[in-house]
From Swiss-Prot:
Classification lineage: Bacteria, Pseudomonadati, Pseudomonadota, Gammaproteobacteria, Pseudomonadales
InterPro entries: Ribosomal_bL28, Ribosomal_bL28/bL31-like_sf, Ribosomal_bL28_bact-type, Ribosomal_bL28_sf
Protein source organism: Pseudomonas fluorescens (strain ATCC BAA-477 / NRRL B-23932 / Pf-5)
GO cellular component term of the entry, any: cytosolic large ribosomal subunit
GO MF term set: structural constituent of ribosome
Protein's name in the database: Large ribosomal subunit protein bL28
Region Disordered, residue ranges: 1-20
Keywords, in A-Z order: Ribonucleoprotein, Ribosomal protein
A single BP term in Gene Ontology: translation
Keyword Repeat tagged: no
Length: 78
């Protein structure tokens, strides 16, 4: 399963580990993804999403129905 937030689209980015001696080695910065069940009152069921912490804040602010409509509009499976 890919490490991408279903709400924001955030995914891994690359960068460097930098040691005290300033040696650089490549690394990946992973998004803070969580599997979370959201209750959708209009459908009378739970929906399980893989969302980042930022995605959860967006759902709290805008509402699960609006966010689900956008995910479905963009072709996401929910």
């Amino acid at each position: 399963m890919s490490r991408v937030c279903q709400v924001t689209g955030k995914g891994p980015v690359t960068g460097n580990n930098i040691s005290h001696a300033n040696n650089k080695t490549r690394r990946r910065f992973l998004p803070n993804l969580q599997h979370h069940r959201f209750w959708v009152e209009s459908e009378k069921r739970f929906v399980r999403l893989r969302v980042s912490a930022k995605g959860m804040r967006i759902i709290d602010k805008r509402g699960i129905d609006v966010v689900l409509a956008e995910i479905r509009r963009d072709g996401g499976k929910v």
